[in-house]
Amino acid sequence: IANKAIWVAKKRYMMNVFDEEGIRFDIPKLKIMGVEAVKSSTPEVCRGKIKDAIRVIMNDSEDALIKFVADFKEVFKTLSPEEVAFPRSCNYLDKYVDPNSIYKKGTPIHVKGALIYNHYILKNKLQRKYPLIKDGDKIKFLMLRQPNTVKDTVVSFATKIPYEFDLHKYVDYETQFTKTFTDPLRFVLDSI
């Protein structure tokens, strides 16, 4: 039994549940299926905040949601690049390598970032300090502002961005925030 529910698409919904299979809740439990708040490809910090935003959507006003988003945006800009990066699995690196230009046209963005990372690790002779990304690795990728030291809009990494790349000041927090937080929320709000 739920007092509110939003269906975004088939198998993608959120509900304010008061009674689930005979178990009653004093405070409604938020049940979420198929939305970015529960997807592993969303940064962990955003998963929690998307759930909180959905709670605000279900139980509060539009003004409260606007304030919540604005407050989180300020916090988001202070987080480390590693915290705001998109997690992904990396496969088929060999398929997309181009010896002339690092990567081929049509390369998925996270693979492109991994190939750029590997290129600059080898170019700067940092392979003893940082492991190369290989097929099957769990990685994170970030959008970058240009111009920057890797001359591209993305970089991937395994655990942290090598400080030798000098990229921390080029992280595109606006794009990261839009893609990791506001776009998933907009998808929910558009269906209301």
Predicted regions and their residues:
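DNA-dependent DNA polymerase catalytic subunits
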Residues: 2-192
